[in-house]
């Protein structure tokens, strides 16, 4: 007796892992095809993704920036201490101006040093436009005051020492040292001001 045989033979189902791989391959092919079509229709209108650049050395929130702030504060405090150690500086307006500018410079630099330390501890980048603008304006103001006070004190020191020749009755060495410290503080401030201005202008 002849028995009929089935026309369709059963096929074992593929394992789930093979199904997942096949589905992923189909999805990738579909995505590539869609992307190619979009690129063909979009042409040159597609914008490249932005690349975030690293902060330059000396920028706010970097070890270099913290070092500059500490140097600024140190020499401003040194200028203040040396000038305040003399008992006759209040009689000269330029020296009083230097003391006031040194106090402002020291407070400003120490405040930004604290901000840099916080940014380094939490590993944040100080790229906020408002913060960079405040840093730039503050550096510009304190830098102008410090440079003006140092130049005025240098002029008075030269007048006392070279023109009037009365250093025997004054603390010319202390005046010269305080003036030099103020200039060094300003030179340390200049890179911070330039970097902040460049960062603000490049946005």
Curated annotation (Swiss-Prot):
- List all topological domains (Extracellular): 85-94, 161-177
Q: Mind listing the UniProt keywords for this protein, alphabetically?
A: Cell membrane, Membrane, Transmembrane, Transmembrane helix
State where the protein is found.
Answer: Cell membrane
| Major location (coarse) | membrane
What membrane topology is given? Multi-pass membrane protein
Task: List the transmembrane segments.
Answer: 64-84, 95-115, 140-160, 178-198
Q: Tell me the domain of life.
A: Eukaryota
Keyword Transport assigned: no
The record's similarity note reads: Belongs to the Casparian strip membrane proteins (CASP) family.
Xref: PANTHER family: CASP-LIKE PROTEIN 5A2, CASP-LIKE PROTEIN 5B3
Tell me how this protein assembles: Homodimer and heterodimers.
The name of this protein is CASP-like protein 5A2
Q: From which organism does this entry originate?
A: Oryza sativa subsp. japonica
